[in-house]
């Protein structure tokens, strides 16, 4: 699974996932399913934000090619992927600037158009079950929840899906592709079932051979993407936020 993750996801997503796990004392080489889950969640958060801007009137704009107009501002502030101290600093800055209620838990995004924090969920189970778990944990009507599944299902607070259908379809397609690629390599069952994951871990620890069927090289093509993860207070006129060029899983 670890080798699959490193081949399947953009290197910066992998690096951010590793830092996140190490921050909590977890080892990506051992807890490989969690490693895959974190990378997937990060990618969905970045895809959610990608290409979406707002103009000076606060109207939503989608810009998919070239540099956006200087008057446009990224619609979403990406909080996920930052270390906890930086993330809370960003959240506090947003709350102080906009007057929105400070969330109890770190959210994943902030939507400048709708003026709300967003919690993104990616589940291997039923979307409504995971949605209820998120809602019970957050216990706040101020934070918007949007859940995606690997089967193409989604669920959001008050059925408000925030993004246009095409943007959401791009996320669903990517998740379905990840599922298919995992399944083709015999990794999906262990990714879904904790019991199967433990069995697979024991098997992996006994074997030192690399995952079969995975290419040695990955194409590093880039789209309008990954600029910088700057603290938002350093440049009030910034137009750059965390961007990523998402590599699709290499075909067998």
From Swiss-Prot:
Domain of life of the organism encoding this protein: Viruses
GO molecular function, one term: RNA binding
GO BP of this protein: viral RNA genome replication; viral translational frameshifting
Record site: Important for efficient shutoff activity: 202-203, 206
Pfam family for this entry, one: Flu_PA
Subcellular location, record wording: Host cytoplasm; Host nucleus
Active-site residues annotated for this sequence: 80, 108
Disulphide-bridged cysteine pairs: none
Keywords tagged on the record: Decay of host mRNAs by virus, Eukaryotic host gene expression shutoff by virus, Host cytoplasm, Host gene expression shutoff by virus, Host mRNA suppression by virus, Host nucleus, Host-virus interaction
Site feature (Important for efficient shutoff activity and nuclear localization) residues: 195, 198-199
Domain notes: The probable endonuclease active site in the N-terminus and the basic amino acid cluster in the C-terminus are important for the shutoff activity. The C-terminus acts as a nuclear localization signal. The C-terminus is recruited to host protein complexes involved in nuclear Pol II RNA processing.
Protein's job: Plays a major role in the shutoff of the host protein expression by cleaving mRNAs probably via an endonuclease activity. This host shutoff allows the virus to escape from the host antiviral response. Hijacks host RNA splicing machinery to selectively target host RNAs containing introns for destruction. This may explain the preferential degradation of RNAs that have undergone co- or post-transcriptional processing.
Family per record: Belongs to the influenza viruses PA-X family.
Name this protein carries in UniProt: Protein PA-X
Lineage start: Viruses, Riboviria, Orthornavirae, Negarnaviricota, Polyploviricotina
């Amino acid at each position: 699974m670890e080798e699959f993750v490193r081949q399947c996801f953009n290197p910066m997503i992998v690096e951010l996932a590793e830092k996140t796990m190490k921050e909590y004392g977890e080892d990506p080489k051992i807890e490989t399913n969690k490693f895959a889950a974190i990378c997937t969640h990060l990618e969905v958060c970045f895809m959610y934000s990608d290409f979406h801007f707002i103009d000076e009137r606060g109207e939503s704009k989608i810009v998919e090619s070239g540099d956006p107009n200087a008057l446009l501002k990224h619609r979403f502030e990406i909080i996920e992927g930052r270390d906890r101290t930086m993330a809370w600093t960003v959240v506090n800055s947003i709350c102080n600037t906009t007057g929105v209620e400070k969330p109890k838990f770190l959210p994943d995004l902030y939507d400048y158009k709708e003026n709300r924090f967003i919690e993104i969920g990616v589940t291997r189970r039923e979307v409504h079950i995971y949605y209820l778990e998120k809602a019970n944990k957050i216990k706040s009507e101020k934070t918007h929840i949007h859940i995606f599944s690997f089967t193409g299902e989604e669920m959001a607070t008050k059925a408000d899906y925030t993004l246009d259908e095409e943007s959401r379809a791009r996320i669903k397609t990517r998740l379905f592709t990840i599922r298919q690629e995992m399944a083709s390599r015999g990794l999906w069952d262990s990714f879904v079932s904790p019991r199967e994951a433990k069995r697979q871990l024991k098997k992996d620890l006994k074997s030192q051979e690399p995952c079969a069927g995975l290419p040695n090289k990955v194409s590093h093509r880039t789209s309008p993407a990954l600029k910088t993860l700057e603290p938002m207070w350093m440049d009030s006129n910034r137009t750059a936020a965390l961007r990523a060029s998402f590599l699709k899983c290499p075909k067998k």
